[in-house]
A protein has these predicted regions:
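C-terminal binding/interaction regions
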Residues: 252-260, 267-268, 281, 449-507
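Short, structured beta-strand/loop micro-motifs enriched in basic residues and often containing a Trp
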Residues: 314-324
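Short, charged beta-turn/beta-strand-edge "cap" motif at the junction between a beta-strand
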Residues: 337, 343-347, 483
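Short, well-ordered loop/turn sites that connect or cap secondary structure elements
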Residues: 329-332, 338
Length: 507
């Protein structure tokens, strides 16, 4: 009988979450590099370049791929012949491992988990509790999968209760464009079919734990070998989702998904539950077994697994944000690449809610935003000699409902985030001759290298959601919504969908 010791299990969980914070799965890197090689849209290729370069930097520096180091998810398959030498419950051991990983002094990870989600929403400080799925199976080992998934992609999860005769392909192709770019494509789609609603969602999440291997399936189809129903569906969805032209970061292009994963389960005769969960550019998961011989040893990938490319935005225009005016902003056009220099402020969900509440009460804000830019970010705490930890953008659409009031009552000139802006936000930007700039999701460590000074200037009690002042040098951004309200995310995907020519563009 296998005996799993408490400390071995806890340390294995801790090591796994540290490991995936800075190592992409090699299969993801290989798939992204293939997409990079064939990409024809310069803006999308630039975004993929940043993701690939950032990934290698993180592997070398052992720092997080993304500032959103995710909510910890653990899949366990525990053999029936396993005995535990432990005083803690399995859940408590998992959570202790997560706690150790996220508070590690050499690579502190961001605590993003909030207790009392419908009320006070208070940070638990150590990213616990984890979400745990445990299954008792035959055997004498413990199979463990650890995954860290950020809010940007989790928030785009979808569930539909289709009629038995409804087309899954039609539903997916109708749904993907409604998800925007907040899930940070190019990524992987996980689809669960059948069972009950909660089973379909679990299948979709579990499917994302497998390796990217769509190229093997393409080779199988080309050889004339017979495909299963799910294999044929994977290939059809892979081709047609990419034909939508959404592209990397929603900028338009040839590749939106690097793979499509599907798991299914028998379902009721009256039902066809279908769930879809995307994995973002910060795909993070690792699998291992414990057999009682001690804690797991995870073999680091070789740096040779990363492509030898560098990021140098030669076409970027340097901008002094300390002297920014509406007149200068008006000269920027959708798609322009800028290199920001000077002081910017940060602020995301909680800070915006508090600022708007203060404005509604007639109170003075603690920061003067006149002619300033605000960056939607919740950075990782610094370690060693860092000014700030990884500091990539968060999804901008969550701030849409605050945009008009912030622009009209604070003197704010522009915003920096990831993904698209909604119609109302674009109108507010146009009405106020402001601007929205996009930083690349999945390039948090690369962005952090452009931040030369950082200090909290307001709302320190909000933790990672506090307002910081950053002094930046050559921080790369793209004009996503210009002062006339033109949005690259609204225009570019349709252009590339038409260019690919598989799916007609609706007028």
């Amino acid at each position: 009988m296998t005996v799993i010791k408490q400390e071995d299990f806890i340390q294995s969980i801790a090591d796994a979450f540290q490991f995936i914070s800075y190592y992409h799965p090699v299969d993801y890197i290989q798939a992204l590099y293939k997409a990079w090689q064939k990409e024809e849209n310069p803006a999308a290729k630039d975004a993929m370049t940043q993701i690939l370069v950032n990934s290698r930097m993180c592997a070398e520096g052992h720092r997080p791929i993304c500032q959103d180091t995710g909510i910890a998810t653990v899949f366990l398959k525990v053999g029936m012949n396993v005995q535990w030498d432990a005083k803690m419950s399995v859940a408590d051991m998992v959570n202790e491992g997560v706690r150790r990983a996220y508070t590690h002094p050499d690579n502190t990870l961001r605590a993003s988990v909030l207790a009392d989600p419908a009320g006070k929403r208070q940070n638990t400080k150590d990213n616990t509790p984890a979400v745990i799925h445990m299954e008792i199976v035959a055997g004498d080992k413990v199979e463990v999968t650890c995954a860290a998934k950020g809010g940007g992609s989790e928030n785009k999860s979808k569930l539909a209760m289709l009629n038995p005769s409804d087309s899954i392909v039609d539903w997916v192709l109708k749904t993907i464009p409604t998800m925007g770019a907040g899930w940070c494509p190019p990524g992987i789609l996980g689809i669960g079919i059948g069972g009950t609603p909660e089973k379909a969602m679990l299948l979709a999440k579990e499917s994302l734990m497998s390796h990217a291997d769509i190229h093997e399936l393409q080779e199988k189809a080309a050889s004339g070998a017979e495909l299963s129903t799910t294999e044929a569906l994977r290939l059809e969805l892979f081709e047609k989702v990419n034909a939508l032209g959404i592209g990397a970061q929603g900028l338009g292009g040839l590749t939106t998904v690097l793979d499509v994963k599907i798991l299914d389960y028998p379902t009721h005769a009256a039902s066809k539950p279908v769930a879809m969960i995307p994995n973002c550019a910060a795909t993070r998961h690792v699998e291992f077994e414990l057999d009682g011989s001690g804690p797991v040893h995870l073999e680091p990938p070789s740096l040779e697994d990363w492509p030898d490319i560098t990021y140098n935005p030669e076409n970027g225009k340097r901008v002094n944000v300390d002297t920014l005016t509406k007149e200068e902003v008006a000269t920027w056009k959708m798609g322009d690449v800028l290199l920001l220099n000077g002081k910017i402020y940060t602020g995301r969900d909680a800070a915006h809610k508090r600022m708007v509440d203060m404005l509604n009460k007639g109170e003075k804000l603690p920061v003067d935003f006149t002619n300033k830019l605000i960056y939607y970010v919740g950075p990782v705490d610094p370690v060693r000699d860092e000014v700030v930890g990884p500091a990539g953008p968060t999804t901008a659409t969550r701030m849409d409902k605050f945009t008009r009031q912030m622009l009209e009552h604070t003197g704010l000139l522009g915003m920096i985030g990831k993904s698209e802006r909604g119609e109302e936000a674009c109108k507010a930007i146009a009405d106020n001759k402001a601007v929205y700039l996009m930083a690349v999701g999945g390039s948090a460590y690369l962005v952090a290298k452009a931040i030369k000074k950082a200090k909290v200037v307001a709302f320190e009690d909000l933790g990672m959601e506090a307002i910081y002042e950053f002094e930046v040098k050559d921080m790369p951004v793209t004009v996503a919504v210009d002062s006339s309200g033109q949005s690259v995310h609204a225009i570019a995907p349709k252009k590339w969908q038409a260019k690919i020519g598989i799916i007609p563009v609706e007028s």
